[in-house]
Amino acid sequence: MSYTLDSLGNPSAYRRVTETRSSFSRISGSPSSGFRSQSWSRGSPSTVSSSYKRSALAPRLTYSSAMLSSAESSLDFSQSSSLLDGGSGPGGDYKLSRSNEKEQIQGLNDRFAGYIEKVHYLEQQNKEIEAEIQALRQKQASHAQLGDAYDQEIRELRATLEMVNHEKAQVQLDSDHLEEDIHRLKERFEEEARLRDDTEAAIRALRKDIEESSLVKVELDKKVQSLQDEVAFLRSNHEEEVADLLAQIQASHITVERKDYLKTDISTALKEIRSQLESHSDQNMHQAEEWFKCRYAKLTEAAEQNKEAIRSAKEEIAEYRRQLQSKSIELESVRGTKESLERQLSDIEERHNHDLSSYQDTIQQLENELRGTKWEMARHLREYQDLLNVKMALDIEIAAYRKLLEGEETRFSTFAGSITGPLYTHRQPSIAISSKIQKTKVEAPKLKVQHKFVEEIIEETKVEDEKSEMEEALTAITEELAVSVKEEVKEEEAEEKEEKEEAEEEVVAAKKSPVKATAPELKEEEGEKEEEEGQEEEEEEEEAAKSDQAEEGGSEKEGSSEKEEGEQEEEGETEAEGEGEEAAAEAKEEKKMEEKAEEVAPKEELAAEAKVEKPEKAKSPVAKSPTTKSPTAKSPEAKSPEAKSPTAKSPTAKSPVAKSPTAKSPEAKSPEAKSPTAKSPTAKSPAAKSPAPKSPVEEVKPKAEAGAEKGEQKEKVEEEKKEAKESPKEEKAEKKEEKPKDVPEKKKAESPVKAESPVKEEVPAKPVKVSPEKEAKEEEKPQEKEKEKEKVEEVGGKEEGGLKESRKEDIAINGEVEGKEEEQETKEKGSGGEEEKGVVTNGLDVSPGDEKKGGDKSEEKVVVTKMVEKITSEGGDGATKYITKSVTVTQKVEEHEETFEEKLVSTKKVEKVTSHAIVKEVTQSD
C-alpha cells in the first residue's frame, strides 16, 4: 500500500527511490490510487483525490523545489551504496555517507512534516464536513417542523371541509323532505280534482238520462194529444150526425114518434158507443202507461248496471293512478338518494385520490431524502476509508523510517568493523517494507467490505426507482398479454407456480443481502484494471464490438437455440429414465467445480437458481415440438453444457403473463441479481488448484469437433426458422444485457450467437505470482464459504425438486459450465493420463506452483482465441449464410526479481444496460 506524492510536486522524486518496490510507485492521478481510494459515483472519477489535489496547494507553497531536488538526489539507496563501495578511503566514504544521511534525514523530516500538515488539514476539513452535516440535519429538522405545521393546517381544513359537507348533506336532506311534502300535496290536489271530475261526469250522465226521459214524455204527450184530438173530432162528427137525424125526425109527427123511438135507440146507442170508446181509450191509455213504465224500468236497470261497471272501472283507474303516483314518488326519492350517494362517493373518491397522491408524493420525497442520505453516508464512508488508508500508509512509512533509523544506528555501531555492514543494513529495511506492503495488500479486501454493502444498497435503490417509473407501462402491457394467453395454460401451471415460487422467493429474499455484498468490489478492481491494463482493455473493446456485431447478425439463430433449449428442458423430465446416469455424473462434476470456483458468492448462485426456475415454468407449451427428437439432442455434444446457452434463461425470457402484473412484475426479478458482475475475479481464490497453462494444440482439438457439429447444425436450421422469428426481441434484450461483459468473460459464458454454435473456445491460463501470505490467507476462505454453500444448497435442493437442468443453466449464466466442459475435453484428448483440476478466473490461471519455475525472472504468455459462428437464415428463399469470425489476442508479461504484477479482468457493471434490458422486454410484450 502506498500514498500519493502528488501534493509534494513531482512524483518522480519518490518513484526513483522505490523502483525496487512496485507497490510504492503508483500515482494518484488515475481513478484508483495505491490504496484503492476509488470513487463510487459514476459522474466524478475520484472525489477524495480531488480534495487532496485542492489541499495540495498549501504544501506546495511551503516547500521549495530545492528541497525536493535534495530529497530526489538523496533518497536513492542504491546510489549511496555504490558511492560507499567506490569511495577512495574509509574516512572520505564515511564523511560522504554522513552528509548523504543528513540530507536524507532532512528530506524525510520535511516529508513527515508535510504529512503531518496534511493530516491536520484533513482533520480540519473533517470538522467542517461534520459542521455541514449538523447544519443539514438542523435544516431537515426545521423542514420537518414546517411539515407538521402544514399537516396541522391541512387537518383543520379537512375538518372544516367535512363540516361543510355535513351541512350540505343536511340541507340536501331538508330539501328532499320538502320535495316529498310538495309531492304529497300535489297528489292530494290531483285526487280531489279526480273526484270532482267523477261527480261532474255523473251529473252529466244523469242530465242525459233526464233529457232522454223528457223526450219520451214529450212523445207520449203528443200521442195523448193526438188521441184526444181524434176523440174530439169523432165526437163532433157524431154530434153532427145526431143533429141531422134529429132535424129529419122533427119534420113529421110520425116521424117524430118514430124519431123519438129512434131517438131513444140512438141515445142508448151513443151511450154504448161512448162507453165503448172510453173503455177503448182507457185501455189504450193503460197499455201506453204500462209500456212506458216497462220501458223506463228497463232503461233504468241498464243505466244502473252500466253505472256500476263504470264506477268500478273508474275506481280501478283511480287506484292504479294512485299506485303509479306513489311508485313514481318513491322512484324520484330513490333517484335523489342515489344521486346524493353518488355525489358523496365521488367526493370521497376525489378526497381519497388526493390523499393517495399526497401520500405518494410524501413517499417519493422521503425516498429521495433516504437516497440522498445513503449517498452522503457512502461518501462519508469512502472518505473515512480513504483516511484509514492514509493513516495506514503513514503508519507503514513511519515504521519504515524507524527501521531505517535503527538500521543506521546499527550501521554506525558496526561501521568500524567492515564496509559491507551498511550495505546489508540498507537492504534489510527494503525487504521489511516489501513484506509489509504485501501484507497490507492482502489485508486490503477486509477494509473494502465496510463500504461494499453501502454501494449495493444504493444500486438496489436505483433498480427500485426504475421499477416505480415503469410500473404503469408494465402493468398495462401485462394485462393486455393476459388476455391473449390461453386459459388452459393458466389453469395447469398456476398451482405449481404458486407453491414453488413462494418457497423460492423466501430463499431469494433471505440470501439477497450477502449476495449483493460482493458486487461493489468489481468497480474498484475495474478502476485498477483501467490503470494497469490500458492497452489490453482497448483490444478487449475491439473484440467486444466484433462480438456485438456477430450477436446482432445471428439473432435468428439465437432465437431458435432458445426455443430448442426450452423444449429440451421441458421434455427433460420424461427422458430422465434414459439419461439418469449421465445427469447424475454431470451434477457431481458441477458440484466439484462449484466448490472450487464459486467461493465468495455461493448464495448468489442459489438466488440465481431460484430465479432461473421461474422462467422455465413460465414457458408456454408452444415450445413442445418434435425438434427435441433430432439426432443432435442425443449426441455427446448436445448433452454438454455448451448446448445449453447461458442466455437461454436470461431475465428477458421470462413470461410476465402467467404472473400477476403487480406481485410478480419483471422488475421484481431484475437482471441485476443475475448480472455476471456478481462473479468478481477476487471471488475465485488464487490459491485454488489450477492446471498449467494449456498449449495451443489443445485449442485446435475443440475446433476440430466444430466441423463435425456443423453438419448436424445445418439440419436444425430448417426446423428452427419458424421458431427463430418469434423471439427477436428477447435476443435484443439479451444482447443488451451481455454488452457490459469483458471479453474473457464472454469467452466463458458465450454470447447468444454461440448458443448452438459447434465452435468451442480455449482460454489458456496465465500464471500470476502471488505472495505466500496472500496464498495462506485465501486458502482459509474456501473452507468457510464451502460450508455456507452446503447449507444453502440443502435449502435449494428442496425447492428445485427434480429440475437439475435449471441448475446447469444457472451455472451457465455465471460463465462456468462451458469452461468446465472445455477442460474435460482437453483432459480426455490432449492431456492423456494427466488429471488436472483448476479454476480459470476470467481467462487467468492463478497457479502458485509455477512461481518458482522461472526463478527471479519469468515470462508469461496469454493467448485468447475467440471464434464466432454466425448463422443467418433468410425466410424468403430459405437460403442460409455461414459467417465465421476469429479474434486472437496475445499478451506477454515479464516479471523481475521480487516484483509481481497481478492482472485481473473484472466485469463491468452498468445499471443503464439493465434498464435497457427491461425496456426491450416491454417491447417484446407489445
UniProtKB/Swiss-Prot annotation:
<keyword id="KW-0677">Repeat</keyword>
<feature type="modified residue" description="Phosphoserine">
    <location>
        <position position="468"/>
    </location>
</feature>
<dbReference type="GO" id="GO:0005737">
    <property type="term" value="C:cytoplasm"/>
</dbReference>
<feature type="region of interest" description="Coil 1B">
    <location>
        <begin position="150"/>
        <end position="248"/>
    </location>
</feature>
<dbReference type="GO" id="GO:0030424">
    <property type="term" value="C:axon"/>
</dbReference>
<dbReference type="GO" id="GO:0033693">
    <property type="term" value="P:neurofilament bundle assembly"/>
</dbReference>
<feature type="compositionally biased region" description="Basic and acidic residues">
    <location>
        <begin position="585"/>
        <end position="619"/>
    </location>
</feature>
<feature type="compositionally biased region" description="Basic and acidic residues">
    <location>
        <begin position="849"/>
        <end position="860"/>
    </location>
</feature>
<feature type="modified residue" description="Phosphoserine">
    <location>
        <position position="430"/>
    </location>
</feature>
<feature type="modified residue" description="Phosphoserine">
    <location>
        <position position="771"/>
    </location>
</feature>
<feature type="compositionally biased region" description="Low complexity">
    <location>
        <begin position="673"/>
        <end position="692"/>
    </location>
</feature>
<feature type="repeat" description="12">
    <location>
        <begin position="669"/>
        <end position="673"/>
    </location>
</feature>
<feature type="domain" description="IF rod">
    <location>
        <begin position="101"/>
        <end position="412"/>
    </location>
</feature>
<feature type="compositionally biased region" description="Basic and acidic residues">
    <location>
        <begin position="544"/>
        <end position="563"/>
    </location>
</feature>
<dbReference type="Pfam" id="PF04732">
    <property type="entry name" value="Filament_head"/>
</dbReference>
<feature type="modified residue" description="Phosphothreonine">
    <location>
        <position position="677"/>
    </location>
</feature>
<feature type="modified residue" description="Phosphoserine">
    <location>
        <position position="670"/>
    </location>
</feature>
<dbReference type="Pfam" id="PF00038">
    <property type="entry name" value="Filament"/>
</dbReference>
<feature type="repeat" description="13">
    <location>
        <begin position="674"/>
        <end position="678"/>
    </location>
</feature>
<feature type="modified residue" description="Phosphoserine">
    <location>
        <position position="547"/>
    </location>
</feature>
<feature type="modified residue" description="Phosphoserine">
    <location>
        <position position="831"/>
    </location>
</feature>
<feature type="modified residue" description="Phosphoserine">
    <location>
        <position position="484"/>
    </location>
</feature>
<feature type="compositionally biased region" description="Basic and acidic residues">
    <location>
        <begin position="696"/>
        <end position="764"/>
    </location>
</feature>
<feature type="modified residue" description="Phosphoserine">
    <location>
        <position position="685"/>
    </location>
</feature>
<dbReference type="GO" id="GO:0099160">
    <property type="term" value="C:postsynaptic intermediate filament cytoskeleton"/>
</dbReference>
<feature type="modified residue" description="Phosphoserine">
    <location>
        <position position="695"/>
    </location>
</feature>
<feature type="region of interest" description="Coil 2B">
    <location>
        <begin position="292"/>
        <end position="412"/>
    </location>
</feature>
<keyword id="KW-0597">Phosphoprotein</keyword>
<feature type="repeat" description="4">
    <location>
        <begin position="629"/>
        <end position="633"/>
    </location>
</feature>
<feature type="modified residue" description="Phosphoserine">
    <location>
        <position position="30"/>
    </location>
</feature>
<feature type="modified residue" description="Phosphoserine">
    <location>
        <position position="751"/>
    </location>
</feature>
<feature type="repeat" description="7">
    <location>
        <begin position="644"/>
        <end position="648"/>
    </location>
</feature>
<dbReference type="InterPro" id="IPR050405">
    <property type="entry name" value="Intermediate_filament"/>
</dbReference>
<feature type="compositionally biased region" description="Acidic residues">
    <location>
        <begin position="564"/>
        <end position="584"/>
    </location>
</feature>
<feature type="region of interest" description="Linker 12">
    <location>
        <begin position="249"/>
        <end position="265"/>
    </location>
</feature>
<dbReference type="GO" id="GO:0005882">
    <property type="term" value="C:intermediate filament"/>
</dbReference>
<feature type="modified residue" description="Phosphoserine">
    <location>
        <position position="655"/>
    </location>
</feature>
<feature type="compositionally biased region" description="Polar residues">
    <location>
        <begin position="1"/>
        <end position="10"/>
    </location>
</feature>
<feature type="region of interest" description="Tail">
    <location>
        <begin position="413"/>
        <end position="926"/>
    </location>
</feature>
<feature type="repeat" description="15">
    <location>
        <begin position="684"/>
        <end position="688"/>
    </location>
</feature>
<feature type="repeat" description="14">
    <location>
        <begin position="679"/>
        <end position="683"/>
    </location>
</feature>
<keyword id="KW-0206">Cytoskeleton</keyword>
